[in-house]
Amino acid sequence: MEIRPLLMCFALCVVYATSKPTEKKERIHHDAPLSSREHDDAQGFDYDHDAFLGQKEAKSFDDLSPEESKRRLGVIVEKIDGDSDGFVTEVELRAWIKKAQKKYIYENVDRQWKDFDVNNDGMISWEEYRNVTYGTYLDDPEPDDGYNYQHMMARDERRFKMADQNRDQIANKEEFTAFLHPEEYDHMKDIVVLETMEDIDKNGDGFIDLNEYIGDMYNHEDEMEEPDWVATEREQFSEFRDKNKDGKMDREETMDWILPSDYDHAEAEAKHLVYESDSNKDGKLSKEEILNKYDLFVGSQATDFGEALVRHDEF
Protein backbone atom coordinates (compact mmCIF):
# COMPACT_ATOMS: atom_id res chain seq x y z
CA MET A 1 0.00 0.00 0.00
CA GLU A 2 1.38 3.41 -0.95
CA ILE A 3 1.81 6.33 1.46
CA ARG A 4 -1.19 8.65 1.56
CA PRO A 5 -1.20 12.39 0.68
CA LEU A 6 -0.41 14.02 4.02
CA LEU A 7 1.48 11.03 5.34
CA MET A 8 3.58 11.33 2.19
CA CYS A 9 4.13 15.00 2.98
CA PHE A 10 5.40 14.18 6.46
CA ALA A 11 7.62 11.41 5.11
CA LEU A 12 9.18 13.86 2.67
CA CYS A 13 9.73 16.33 5.49
CA VAL A 14 11.65 13.69 7.43
CA VAL A 15 13.78 12.88 4.38
CA TYR A 16 14.41 16.57 3.81
CA ALA A 17 15.37 17.16 7.42
CA THR A 18 17.99 14.41 7.29
CA SER A 19 19.36 15.29 3.85
CA LYS A 20 22.36 17.49 3.12
CA PRO A 21 21.65 21.12 4.09
CA THR A 22 22.72 22.42 0.67
CA GLU A 23 20.06 20.43 -1.17
CA LYS A 24 17.24 22.52 -2.60
CA LYS A 25 13.59 21.63 -2.00
CA GLU A 26 11.45 22.14 -5.10
CA ARG A 27 7.80 23.19 -4.84
CA ILE A 28 7.15 24.46 -8.37
CA HIS A 29 4.80 22.28 -10.43
CA HIS A 30 5.48 22.11 -14.19
CA ASP A 31 3.70 20.08 -16.85
CA ALA A 32 5.95 17.40 -18.23
CA PRO A 33 7.09 18.18 -21.80
CA LEU A 34 5.40 16.22 -24.56
CA SER A 35 8.80 15.26 -25.94
CA SER A 36 12.49 15.99 -25.54
CA ARG A 37 12.81 16.38 -29.32
CA GLU A 38 12.36 19.48 -31.46
CA HIS A 39 8.92 19.82 -33.04
CA ASP A 40 9.82 20.13 -36.72
CA ASP A 41 7.41 18.32 -39.04
CA ALA A 42 9.64 19.17 -42.00
CA GLN A 43 12.20 16.78 -40.53
CA GLY A 44 9.68 14.10 -39.60
CA PHE A 45 7.21 13.26 -36.85
CA ASP A 46 9.65 12.23 -34.13
CA TYR A 47 8.27 14.84 -31.71
CA ASP A 48 4.74 13.58 -32.23
CA HIS A 49 5.80 9.96 -31.85
CA ASP A 50 7.53 10.64 -28.53
CA ALA A 51 4.82 12.97 -27.30
CA PHE A 52 1.85 10.75 -27.98
CA LEU A 53 3.39 7.30 -27.95
CA GLY A 54 6.03 7.68 -25.30
CA GLN A 55 9.60 6.87 -26.22
CA LYS A 56 9.38 3.28 -25.00
CA GLU A 57 6.13 2.52 -26.82
CA ALA A 58 7.13 4.12 -30.13
CA LYS A 59 9.00 1.00 -31.21
CA SER A 60 5.99 -1.23 -30.61
CA PHE A 61 3.92 1.08 -32.81
CA ASP A 62 6.39 0.53 -35.63
CA ASP A 63 5.47 -3.16 -35.60
CA LEU A 64 1.93 -2.43 -36.82
CA SER A 65 1.11 -2.37 -40.52
CA PRO A 66 -0.11 0.97 -41.91
CA GLU A 67 -3.50 -0.55 -42.66
CA GLU A 68 -3.97 -1.87 -39.13
CA SER A 69 -2.74 1.32 -37.52
CA LYS A 70 -5.11 3.39 -39.66
CA ARG A 71 -8.04 1.15 -38.74
CA ARG A 72 -7.27 1.51 -35.05
CA LEU A 73 -6.81 5.23 -35.45
CA GLY A 74 -10.41 5.34 -36.64
CA VAL A 75 -11.51 3.61 -33.44
CA ILE A 76 -9.54 6.09 -31.35
CA VAL A 77 -11.08 9.06 -33.18
CA GLU A 78 -14.45 7.94 -31.83
CA LYS A 79 -13.02 8.00 -28.31
CA ILE A 80 -11.64 11.51 -28.77
CA ASP A 81 -15.06 12.71 -29.96
CA GLY A 82 -16.40 13.20 -26.46
CA ASP A 83 -19.88 14.45 -27.39
CA SER A 84 -20.26 11.89 -30.22
CA ASP A 85 -21.30 14.52 -32.76
CA GLY A 86 -19.07 13.07 -35.46
CA PHE A 87 -16.42 15.76 -35.17
CA VAL A 88 -13.27 16.30 -33.14
CA THR A 89 -12.79 19.84 -31.88
CA GLU A 90 -9.62 21.53 -30.72
CA VAL A 91 -10.93 21.38 -27.16
CA GLU A 92 -11.52 17.63 -27.41
CA LEU A 93 -8.06 17.11 -28.88
CA ARG A 94 -6.44 19.11 -26.09
CA ALA A 95 -8.34 17.13 -23.45
CA TRP A 96 -7.22 13.85 -25.03
CA ILE A 97 -3.59 14.98 -25.19
CA LYS A 98 -3.68 16.18 -21.57
CA LYS A 99 -5.11 12.82 -20.54
CA ALA A 100 -2.29 11.07 -22.35
CA GLN A 101 0.17 13.32 -20.51
CA LYS A 102 -1.35 12.17 -17.23
CA LYS A 103 -1.10 8.48 -18.05
CA TYR A 104 1.43 7.83 -15.29
CA ILE A 105 -0.89 9.54 -12.81
CA TYR A 106 -3.86 7.37 -13.72
CA GLU A 107 -1.67 4.30 -13.42
CA ASN A 108 -0.69 5.42 -9.91
CA VAL A 109 -4.34 5.86 -8.96
CA ASP A 110 -5.23 2.45 -10.37
CA ARG A 111 -2.55 0.86 -8.19
CA GLN A 112 -4.01 2.45 -5.06
CA TRP A 113 -7.69 2.08 -5.90
CA LYS A 114 -8.20 -1.44 -4.60
CA ASP A 115 -6.66 -0.50 -1.24
CA PHE A 116 -9.40 2.03 -0.54
CA ASP A 117 -12.47 0.67 -2.33
CA VAL A 118 -13.14 -1.65 0.58
CA ASN A 119 -16.69 -2.59 -0.40
CA ASN A 120 -15.80 -2.97 -4.10
CA ASP A 121 -18.59 -0.69 -5.30
CA GLY A 122 -16.39 1.16 -7.76
CA MET A 123 -16.32 4.29 -5.59
CA ILE A 124 -14.28 5.47 -2.61
CA SER A 125 -16.09 7.20 0.23
CA TRP A 126 -14.40 9.54 2.68
CA GLU A 127 -15.07 6.97 5.41
CA GLU A 128 -13.26 4.28 3.45
CA TYR A 129 -10.26 6.49 2.84
CA ARG A 130 -10.17 7.72 6.45
CA ASN A 131 -10.43 4.27 7.97
CA VAL A 132 -7.77 2.75 5.72
CA THR A 133 -5.35 5.66 6.07
CA TYR A 134 -5.81 6.80 9.66
CA GLY A 135 -7.65 4.00 11.46
CA THR A 136 -4.67 2.54 13.31
CA TYR A 137 -3.17 5.94 14.10
CA LEU A 138 -6.40 7.30 15.58
CA ASP A 139 -6.61 4.38 17.99
CA ASP A 140 -3.80 6.07 19.93
CA PRO A 141 -4.82 9.62 20.90
CA GLU A 142 -1.25 10.51 21.89
CA PRO A 143 1.18 8.82 19.47
CA ASP A 144 4.84 9.04 20.42
CA ASP A 145 6.08 9.84 16.91
CA GLY A 146 5.28 13.54 17.26
CA TYR A 147 2.76 13.73 14.42
CA ASN A 148 -0.71 15.23 14.82
CA TYR A 149 -2.80 12.73 12.90
CA GLN A 150 -6.05 14.51 13.73
CA HIS A 151 -4.72 17.61 12.00
CA MET A 152 -3.46 15.59 9.04
CA MET A 153 -6.83 13.89 8.70
CA ALA A 154 -8.65 17.23 8.80
CA ARG A 155 -6.49 18.53 5.97
CA ASP A 156 -7.10 15.40 3.93
CA GLU A 157 -10.85 15.70 4.51
CA ARG A 158 -10.79 19.30 3.33
CA ARG A 159 -8.95 18.25 0.17
CA PHE A 160 -11.32 15.31 -0.36
CA LYS A 161 -14.31 17.67 -0.20
CA MET A 162 -12.69 19.97 -2.74
CA ALA A 163 -12.11 17.05 -5.12
CA ASP A 164 -15.65 15.74 -4.55
CA GLN A 165 -17.35 18.01 -7.07
CA ASN A 166 -20.89 16.69 -6.58
CA ARG A 167 -20.51 16.91 -2.78
CA ASP A 168 -21.76 13.38 -2.05
CA GLN A 169 -18.72 12.43 0.09
CA ILE A 170 -17.95 9.66 -2.40
CA ALA A 171 -15.19 9.88 -5.01
CA ASN A 172 -15.31 8.36 -8.45
CA LYS A 173 -12.05 7.60 -10.27
CA GLU A 174 -11.60 11.14 -11.62
CA GLU A 175 -12.41 12.77 -8.28
CA PHE A 176 -10.02 10.47 -6.44
CA THR A 177 -7.33 11.31 -8.98
CA ALA A 178 -7.90 15.00 -8.26
CA PHE A 179 -7.60 14.24 -4.54
CA LEU A 180 -4.29 12.40 -4.89
CA HIS A 181 -2.86 14.74 -7.55
CA PRO A 182 -4.50 18.15 -6.98
CA GLU A 183 -1.80 20.06 -8.85
CA GLU A 184 -3.08 18.51 -12.09
CA TYR A 185 -6.59 20.01 -11.85
CA ASP A 186 -7.64 23.64 -12.22
CA HIS A 187 -10.42 23.38 -9.62
CA MET A 188 -7.88 22.08 -7.07
CA LYS A 189 -5.32 24.87 -7.43
CA ASP A 190 -6.66 26.84 -4.46
CA ILE A 191 -6.19 23.87 -2.12
CA VAL A 192 -2.63 23.33 -3.40
CA VAL A 193 -1.82 26.96 -2.63
CA LEU A 194 -3.54 26.83 0.76
CA GLU A 195 -1.67 23.68 1.84
CA THR A 196 1.63 25.13 0.64
CA MET A 197 1.10 28.34 2.59
CA GLU A 198 0.12 26.41 5.71
CA ASP A 199 3.35 24.42 5.44
CA ILE A 200 5.62 27.43 4.96
CA ASP A 201 3.88 30.21 6.93
CA LYS A 202 5.44 29.54 10.33
CA ASN A 203 4.21 32.70 12.08
CA GLY A 204 0.62 32.17 10.98
CA ASP A 205 0.06 35.63 9.50
CA GLY A 206 -1.33 34.27 6.24
CA PHE A 207 1.70 35.28 4.18
CA ILE A 208 5.12 33.89 3.25
CA ASP A 209 7.98 36.23 4.08
CA LEU A 210 11.57 35.95 2.83
CA ASN A 211 12.83 33.99 5.84
CA GLU A 212 9.96 31.50 5.57
CA TYR A 213 10.51 31.18 1.82
CA ILE A 214 14.22 30.42 2.22
CA GLY A 215 13.67 28.30 5.32
CA ASP A 216 11.34 25.98 3.42
CA MET A 217 13.96 25.07 0.82
CA TYR A 218 17.23 25.44 2.72
CA ASN A 219 18.08 23.63 5.95
CA HIS A 220 20.76 25.94 7.37
CA GLU A 221 23.44 24.66 9.73
CA ASP A 222 25.56 27.12 11.73
CA GLU A 223 29.03 26.27 10.49
CA MET A 224 28.03 25.63 6.90
CA GLU A 225 28.66 28.28 4.24
CA GLU A 226 25.45 29.26 2.47
CA PRO A 227 25.42 27.84 -1.09
CA ASP A 228 25.21 30.20 -4.05
CA TRP A 229 21.72 29.12 -5.05
CA VAL A 230 20.31 30.45 -1.76
CA ALA A 231 21.47 33.96 -2.64
CA THR A 232 19.87 33.50 -6.05
CA GLU A 233 16.59 32.50 -4.42
CA ARG A 234 16.69 35.57 -2.17
CA GLU A 235 17.00 37.68 -5.30
CA GLN A 236 14.21 35.72 -7.00
CA PHE A 237 11.94 36.41 -4.03
CA SER A 238 12.63 40.14 -4.01
CA GLU A 239 12.61 40.70 -7.76
CA PHE A 240 9.97 38.27 -9.03
CA ARG A 241 8.02 36.40 -6.32
CA ASP A 242 7.04 39.44 -4.26
CA LYS A 243 5.29 41.29 -7.07
CA ASN A 244 3.85 44.14 -4.98
CA LYS A 245 7.13 44.61 -3.06
CA ASP A 246 5.59 44.40 0.42
CA GLY A 247 8.17 41.89 1.65
CA LYS A 248 5.89 38.85 1.59
CA MET A 249 3.88 36.64 -0.72
CA ASP A 250 0.09 36.48 -0.57
CA ARG A 251 -2.05 33.68 -2.06
CA GLU A 252 -1.99 35.05 -5.60
CA GLU A 253 1.77 35.51 -5.54
CA THR A 254 2.21 32.03 -4.07
CA MET A 255 0.08 30.54 -6.85
CA ASP A 256 2.19 32.29 -9.48
CA TRP A 257 5.25 30.76 -7.82
CA ILE A 258 4.22 27.13 -7.39
CA LEU A 259 1.74 26.85 -10.28
CA PRO A 260 3.23 29.04 -13.02
CA SER A 261 1.24 29.63 -16.18
CA ASP A 262 3.55 27.70 -18.45
CA TYR A 263 3.24 27.44 -22.19
CA ASP A 264 0.44 24.95 -22.88
CA HIS A 265 2.10 22.33 -25.06
CA ALA A 266 -1.08 20.24 -25.30
CA GLU A 267 -3.08 23.21 -26.56
CA ALA A 268 -0.37 24.08 -29.08
CA GLU A 269 -0.30 20.50 -30.36
CA ALA A 270 -4.10 20.43 -30.66
CA LYS A 271 -4.05 23.68 -32.67
CA HIS A 272 -1.31 22.23 -34.86
CA LEU A 273 -3.28 19.06 -35.59
CA VAL A 274 -6.46 20.97 -36.44
CA TYR A 275 -4.63 23.46 -38.64
CA GLU A 276 -2.86 20.74 -40.61
CA SER A 277 -5.91 18.49 -41.02
CA ASP A 278 -8.95 20.78 -41.33
CA SER A 279 -9.30 20.67 -45.12
CA ASN A 280 -12.63 22.53 -45.27
CA LYS A 281 -11.53 25.08 -42.63
CA ASP A 282 -14.66 24.76 -40.48
CA GLY A 283 -12.61 24.69 -37.26
CA LYS A 284 -13.23 21.02 -36.47
CA LEU A 285 -12.15 17.65 -37.79
CA SER A 286 -14.23 14.89 -39.27
CA LYS A 287 -13.09 11.30 -39.04
CA GLU A 288 -12.35 11.40 -42.76
CA GLU A 289 -10.14 14.47 -42.38
CA ILE A 290 -8.15 12.79 -39.62
CA LEU A 291 -7.69 9.57 -41.57
CA ASN A 292 -6.66 11.56 -44.65
CA LYS A 293 -3.84 12.96 -42.52
CA TYR A 294 -3.05 9.51 -41.17
CA ASP A 295 0.72 10.05 -41.04
CA LEU A 296 0.37 13.18 -38.91
CA PHE A 297 -2.08 11.69 -36.44
CA VAL A 298 -0.33 8.38 -36.14
CA GLY A 299 2.68 10.40 -35.09
CA SER A 300 0.77 12.39 -32.50
CA GLN A 301 -0.16 11.52 -28.96
CA ALA A 302 -3.78 12.35 -29.70
CA THR A 303 -3.91 8.57 -30.05
CA ASP A 304 -2.08 7.51 -26.87
CA PHE A 305 -0.70 4.84 -29.16
CA GLY A 306 1.55 3.12 -26.68
CA GLU A 307 -1.49 1.50 -25.16
CA ALA A 308 -4.36 2.08 -27.57
CA LEU A 309 -2.82 1.05 -30.86
CA VAL A 310 -1.18 -2.16 -29.69
CA ARG A 311 -3.82 -3.35 -27.24
CA HIS A 312 -5.72 -5.83 -29.42
CA ASP A 313 -8.52 -6.64 -27.01
CA GLU A 314 -9.92 -3.09 -27.24
CA PHE A 315 -10.31 -3.28 -31.00
Curated annotation (Swiss-Prot):
List residues binding Ca(2+) 4.
Answer: D201, N203, D205, E212
Residue positions annotated to bind Ca(2+) 1 are: D81, D83, D85, E92
Instruction: Indicate whether Membrane appears among the record's keywords.
Output: yes
* Compartment(s) of residence: Endoplasmic reticulum membrane; Golgi apparatus; Secreted; Melanosome
Q: Which residues bind Ca(2+) 5?
A: D242, N244, D246, K248, E253
| GO CC entries | endoplasmic reticulum membrane; extracellular region; Golgi apparatus; melanosome; sarcoplasmic reticulum lumen
Q: Where does Ca(2+) 3 bind?
A: D164, N166, D168, E175
PANTHER family, per the entry: CALUMENIN, RETICULOCALBIN
User: What is the designated name of this protein?
Assistant: Calumenin-A
Q: Give the species.
A: Salmo salar (Atlantic salmon)
